A protein has these predicted regions:
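Envelope-exposed proteins and targeting segments
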Residues: 36-38, 60, 96-98, 140
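Short active-site neighborhood of thiol/selenol oxidoreductases, capturing the structured segment around
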Residues: 50-74, 79-80, 98
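Solvent-exposed, polar/charged alpha-helical surfaces in well-ordered, non-transmembrane soluble domains
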Residues: 67, 74, 78-85, 110-117, ...
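Short, internal strand/loop/helix patches
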Residues: 113-142
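N-terminal "domain-start" segment that seeds a small globular fold
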Residues: 22-53, 78
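Thiol-based oxidoreductase modules, predominantly thioredoxin-like and allied folds used
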Residues: 92-107, 122-133
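Sec/Tat-exported extracytoplasmic proteins
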Residues: 59, 66, 84-91, 119, ...
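Secretory targeting signatures
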Residues: 1-23
Length: 142
């Protein structure tokens, strides 16, 4: 009797596991049409100029952070790293990541390089002169 009960329970679990579940639920905001951003030049973590036009045609995920941020910025960076890995082949070909400091007075390219390297982040970490950043944030509606 217990053998039949075990087989029945196992069959029910197996069948339940094979049934189709709910579709994935999207919790974000669908931005359609995409927001156009004017071309802008910043400085990357290697001290080289970086132009947004280099990423033309790609979806760009942008995080505004600062390296001395003790709480949410490292979490945002870790989440972006996770997303970049989950994207697989789409990452780099169709989707790009950028991190832009909101503290260019302290976050120069050397500090941005160190921040990215310590966390194993492989996308551009950008900085600029403070007056240029305010121009960019105005254009980006930040």
């Amino acid at each position: 009797m217990s053998r039949v009960l075990t087989l029945l329970v196992a069959s029910c679990l197996l069948i339940a596991g094979c049934l189709e579940g709910d579709e994935d639920i999207f919790y974000g905001d669908d931005i359609n049409p995409p927001v156009a951003v004017e071309d802008f030049i910043l400085v990357d973590e290697n001290g080289d100029y970086f132009s947004f036009s280099e990423l033309e045609g790609k979806v760009i995920v942008v995080a505004f952070l600062f390296t001395r941020c003790p709480d949410i910025c490292p979490v945002v960076s870790a989440n972006m790293n996770y997303v970049s890995q989950e994207l697989g082949d789409l990452y780099g070909t169709e989707v790009a990541m950028l991190s832009i400091t909101v503290d260019p007075w302290r976050d120069n390219s050397t500090i941005m390089h160190s921040y990215a390297e310590q966390r194993g982040l492989d996308w551009p970490h950008l900085t600029t002169a403070s007056e240029d950043l305010s121009d960019f944030t105005d254009l980006s509606d930040v």
